Amino acid sequence: MGFLFTPKHQKLVNQCYPPGRTPDKKPKGSETSYLLYYVNSRRPKLEKVSSYLVKRSTTDLNRRRSGNVSVTLELLAKIVENCNENMNIFIKDFIHIMTLVLNNNNFNNDPTIVGLIERVLEAICNHLDGSLVSGDSEFLELFKNFVTLYFKVANTKLNDTDLVLKGCLDFSKISNLGSIHQWSATAKNCVSIALTKFQERHPIYSEATIDSSFSEPGSPALKKKLTRTQTKVMGLDDVSNTGDYSILALNTFFNTTETDKLTIGLHALIEHLLETPNKELLQFICNGIPVQLRYIVILLFVRPLGTSSEKNMLLILKLISSLLTSAVSIIGLSVIDILRRLITVQLAKSDSTTVVKQIAVTIKDLNRKTYYKQQSSDMFAELSFKFIESGKPHHLELFQLDLDSLISVTSDQCLDLDLFGEFLPYVTDKTQLSKLLYPEAPHQVIFIRFFEKVSTLSKQDTEIAISTSFAYYKAASLLSGLAYYVNNNRPSDGYYAYHHHASKFLGLADYQTQVEFKRKDNDIFTKEDLLNYYSDAGSNIYSEKGRDILLVDHSDQNGTDIDQDTVRYSTPIPLPQISIPPTTTNGIGIKKSSPANDTYVTRSLKHNPVPNVKDLKNLVSSKKDKSNTKTLRGSQSVKSKVTNITFLLDELKNDGDEIKIADPDEEDIIGMEKQDLARSYSLRMNTISSTNSRTLIPSVENAEEHGDDFRDAHEDIEVSSSTRGRLFMV
């Protein structure tokens, strides 16, 4: 009779269990399908079903019914797959059931039972989004403890590597795994397990191929020069053997666009490589990372450099070099940020010779590949800023070491004359340094700074600098140097070196002889001496330009003008002078008027002379002949409005074809003083005197006979009817 009063959800669950006590039971197919339909169509029933499954599984565990426990675990997996949208309702009950099974010593040593638990774990992880459960601390702790218990049972109780790797693979499939801080340790443990099992199955990746001693720059591993034709290194994405769960687990952790998950995996990889430094393993993993995210590997490598031991620092630097010199493609690498970090660590560890030298090797390897245009130029500029402009002369030995290393692998022309002059005293291979100069001649300002820098160099470096300048920039160096040494006319190594190479460049034997005499006597060339060599256009094609430089007053010159057809320049050769725009008393610049406005102002000032007061009075007092027009009655205020408007209309009519009237909103007319404005106004009055018959005020006739007939506003006046339609009353 008790069965008649059993709730429906319990009936449906019980009907899924086949009878008997055999251990290999399977849930009934049709009953299970109906149960899934029942819980899907009635969401409130899910909680009741999960609660009843907890109660029934507890009873089955106590009675050691392994067959029923197997059926329960399969039902859990099916419910998760079919009701994953409402997983938050039953997930805690399901984890509680599996935890009870794993803690029961009668069942946790059964591979079949643990395998069924792994299937439930897989179903949960496939549909679990970390961003949705990150706020439920109770569930996060419950799930973390369950996963830890699963790995413990699979590894220690069963010693089943595949079950362990399957658990790692399942856990890695959680969406937004990296956003859950509580699970980061578990995720890192999964990566470590997968790496260890991978190395056990593939011994080639388990040997230490990098030692912690300093590797000379000439060692084969670090001196490898990449060619244009490269063979792609096999990576995680190239492996087709899906039966190896260690590779599948590593692939899900590293072949992902989720940077948080990738960062967790890379932290575990770095820790693993410090224990067994194998560059092949590093390249294998990195080649499976999406190419646009591989730069993260280098960033995470350099981050712990400052806090690591000397042994680990050397290992990290060598691993970075091995990756930079490998065939693994990397894009988007922030080269300057990496360089700054390396230099900072190098300065902090300047007392360790091995670390300093290894960092120099890594800096060199950083420039073996081109990640963006102007990369080499930026790296040289950064070295100059860190060591030269920072004013720390006790670090110049480090600068020389880094500079020599960087120059040895740089082949593109990326240096300007400024950096060339700065680097020359510190470089060992000065010939290679000169090959890095830009082929285009720089601006004369750069030349002036270059010649100023040359004056501080040794005699040998001065000779190299001047000769290199003439070899690369020829006429630009000749004329710029001439302009500089005319103003700085004093004996020096640079002075004589310039004139020596200038005479060779011009091919003037007498000039060369005089240079040697002047050098011997510590004498200088006068302008008259130099004009002799720039006087004949037949023997010196630069004679005209040279004379301009020699004859100009350099105290206020704007620079020399060099023909660009003769010498190719990237920027004009003349030394620019800063021209300050005209300003008002408050410092705001005045905008000049356009040519049209200038014409208007000029023409408006060329009218008739200014009328006197008597003429104006006669003009106002004149009366129109009443026989030609009808009269209207109006007040004096109306008359004044009509008069003003008529002035404007007549001016536009008569002068519109002759004078371009400027829009005051377009250009500001400057330069008109009070007197000019008065003349302009009076000229307008003059123009009105020649209006047609529509004008209210007639021309002046017999002005001497009339006086001032001013009338008050309340008096009546006569207004011409011809103004009808042109009155704008306000």
Swiss-Prot record:
Q: Which GO terms describe its biological process?
A: protein localization to plasma membrane
Pfam families hit by this protein: EFR3
Q: Which domain of life is it from?
A: Eukaryota
Q: Which GO terms describe its cellular component?
A: plasma membrane
* Family the UniProt entry places it in: Belongs to the EFR3 family.
What's the protein called, per UniProt? Protein EFR3
Name the gene behind this protein: EFR3
